[in-house]
Amino acid sequence: MRYDQFTIKAQGIVQRAQDLAVQTQSPEISPEHLLETLVAQEDGVTQPILQKLGVDIEGIRLKLTQVLERNPKVQGTGQEPVVSQTLKRIFDLALKEATYLRDEYLSTEHLLFGIAEEKTSQAAKILRDHGVIKDQILKSLVAIRGGQQVTDQNAEEKYQSLTRFGQDLTLTAQAGKLDPVIGRDDEVRRILQVLSRRRKK
């Protein structure tokens, strides 16, 4: 796989997954390393996707930590960890998903799709246990992207503007943080009047 097909953020995620594999003394870069770096990325797309699904992100990270602690370790070989066969399959699935979505580059959300689609890894099981499946990811992604496609290597920056600078009023209302409308008849009437005005020709 050619890494120049990845967005800048996706390249960074793969690099951090490799760093995490070195840190955990793993002989391979696994799907669990990849998922941990995706979920930990605060300025990425994965956290907003999972938040829209109401997923316990810290719960996922805790499970990943437990899995990574149990993984086999190697010491003193001086060799870089290699990409596991399962992770190679995830990259292939992610690329297929990017093609299906007519995206020109493989971005971080495609990596999340790939993990969810490749059902044999512990990372995929952790996602399933938290109710994260491919169809749910796609629905959440559509809301975040707003119809935009990945046409360059900085695509995530562009379609995250809405997430970063906007506010999801549905979530705010569900959390009970919206001001009540009771007793504000004049304001409501005025808003309806403004919204229902026809444009003069």
Put a short name on every predicted segment.
Residues M1-K201:
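Histone-fold recognition with a strong bias for associated Lys/Arg-rich disordered tails
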